[in-house]
Amino acid sequence: MNEQQRLASRQANSSTKKEEKDYSKYFESVYQPPSLKLAKKRGKEEVKIERDFGLPEEFRDFGAGRKFYIRTYGCQMNEHDTEVMAGIFTTLGYEPTFSTEEADVILLNTCAIRENAENKVFGELGHLKSLKRRNPDLIIGVCGCMSQEESVVNKIMQKNQHVDMVFGTHNIHRLPYILKDAMFSKETVVEVWSKEGDVIENLPKVRRGDIKAWVNIMYGCDKFCTYCIVPYTRGKERSRRPEDIIKEIRHLAANGYKEITLLGQNVNAYGKDFEDIQYGLGDLMDELRKIDIARIRFTTSHPRDFDDHLIDVLGKGGNLVEHIHLPVQSGSTDMLKIMARKYSREHYLELVRKIKETIPNAVLTTDIIVGFPNETDEQFEETMSLYREVGFDTAFTFIYSPREGTPAAKMQDNVPMEVKKERLQRLNTLVNEYGVNKNKRYIGQIVEVLVEGESKNNPEVLAGYTRTNKLVNFVASKSLIGQLVKVKITEAKTWSLNGELVKEPIEVK
């Protein structure tokens, strides 16, 4: 696209006014790549809260007789975004389907955190090309974090011209308008906002199940770890107002939900953007303790922002679970500095000490990257020793995956792939060893299990999770699905526990 075409594109976008609100201030050419210089310009503009989401009359029964299909890649935030998009589709009159062959609209909600995730999406787009040939009226869309990357949008425009629409993470609430444009346009409709939008409340949702629910408490991230694309794809940190969060969770509790997971790219930064009140995650958790719901947990944490007040509140127990996922990424202070994690090995270990002192039965899990540019054998050994010192129950482990547009992608990488794979294998051996040994401690214990459904491996067996997020399998009546029960653990495996039902459903007070 040349400069003249770019200017024409901007003029076309700014002159097309479908609503009274002017969205042009948010929109920049999708051909502008993410960069630290631009992405770090966290403007001081006030983030507005909009609570009046609604659809104009033109969209009444817009999807009547049509079906939609959404495939989701990546984290819980993407899963929750899919729930919102499903809610919007349903409000438009569409019906869900689990078959791409039956769908009138197919959306791929994408993840940009690792190269493997992107490869899966482009592979799926290739498979959908033949379906589009057979059904030219099919609408295919790409949304989520990949859409925020200039190189991805270019690749879609050049090599995947059967894609009808592309939109990003900041304008999901604009789905009806984007969809309408895609249906009547001969060209691919691209609406990617490089500036994050306002916080939109009261969006419709179709939740997965009626036992556990995700609740966003904030959006975006301002940490700019050198390997991470999220600050570019999700924008600056924006917190929802506590009253809106509390209202949503009270509503879920009243509708029978047993467990809530609070979501954010960095939940520990919650409230730091408020200018009118001093209110953080610890304050929010303290208020949520008073709600009549069995369990509340949160993800994802950043050690830098995990403060003493939050630890003290979590120590009060009640419906606040004893499981904390605390990504460390590396056990080497030098590596952490290059990663721009803004804490040291010593700081992390001191944080763990405080957590264990206040919450003696706390279960800690983590994320670890191996093979970061220029990681030495000694630095990797520091990660191994930290894992042992903390005594994690388990970890999500990854070989470093460079993301275009991040500082780490420009670093010289002198760690051979065979060395990276060997380190990952050694780390996973340690993770598995600790996992099974930690689980063996549960043998003979009676634990509280929230029954979620049938086991994936055996429909005659029920499966659920403990407060510390341990998977438990046991034989019992399917009438217990959705209930809290007591189970005696009889066998420990690396990733799960087996047990026997010892008590009927518990009443949670």
From Swiss-Prot:
Highest taxon, organism lineage: Bacteria
Entry binding sites for [4Fe-4S] cluster 1: 75, 111, 145
CDD domains to which the protein is assigned, alphabetical: Radical_SAM (cd01335)
Signal peptide region: none
Co-factor requirement: [4Fe-4S] cluster
Residue ranges constituting the Radical SAM core domain according to the UniProt record: 207-437
Catalytic activity, EC: 2.8.4.3
Record keyword rRNA-binding present: no
Subcellular location: Cytoplasm
Domain MTTase N-terminal, chain residue ranges per copy: 66-184
Biased composition (Polar residues): 1-15
Segments for region (Disordered): 1-25
Catalytically driven reaction(s): N(6)-dimethylallyladenosine(37) in tRNA + (sulfur carrier)-SH + AH2 + 2 S-adenosyl-L-methionine = 2-methylsulfanyl-N(6)-dimethylallyladenosine(37) in tRNA + (sulfur carrier)-H + 5'-deoxyadenosine + L-methionine + A + S-adenosyl-L-homocysteine + 2 H(+)
Compositional bias per record (Basic and acidic residues), positions renumbered to this chain: 16-25
UniProt keyword annotation of 4Fe-4S present: yes
Keywords: 4Fe-4S, Cytoplasm, Iron, Iron-sulfur, Metal-binding, S-adenosyl-L-methionine, Transferase, tRNA processing
Gene3D superfamilies: Methylthiotransferase, N-terminal domain, tm_1862 like domain
TRAM domain segment(s): 440-503
Entry GO MF terms: 4 iron, 4 sulfur cluster binding; metal ion binding; N6-isopentenyladenosine methylthiotransferase activity
Cofactor note: Binds 2 [4Fe-4S] clusters. One cluster is coordinated with 3 cysteines and an exchangeable S-adenosyl-L-methionine.
Family: Belongs to the methylthiotransferase family. MiaB subfamily.
Subunit description: Monomer.
Family matches, as NCBIfam families: miaB-methiolase, MiaB/RimO family radical SAM methylthiotransferase
Function: Catalyzes the methylthiolation of N6-(dimethylallyl)adenosine (i(6)A), leading to the formation of 2-methylthio-N6-(dimethylallyl)adenosine (ms(2)i(6)A) at position 37 in tRNAs that read codons beginning with uridine.
Classification via PANTHER family: CDK5 REGULATORY SUBUNIT-ASSOCIATED PROTEIN 1 (PTHR43020), MITOCHONDRIAL TRNA METHYLTHIOTRANSFERASE CDK5RAP1 (PTHR43020:SF2)
Official protein name in the record: tRNA-2-methylthio-N(6)-dimethylallyladenosine synthase
Top-level taxonomy: Bacteria, Bacillati, Bacillota, Bacilli, Bacillales
Gene symbol of the encoding locus: miaB
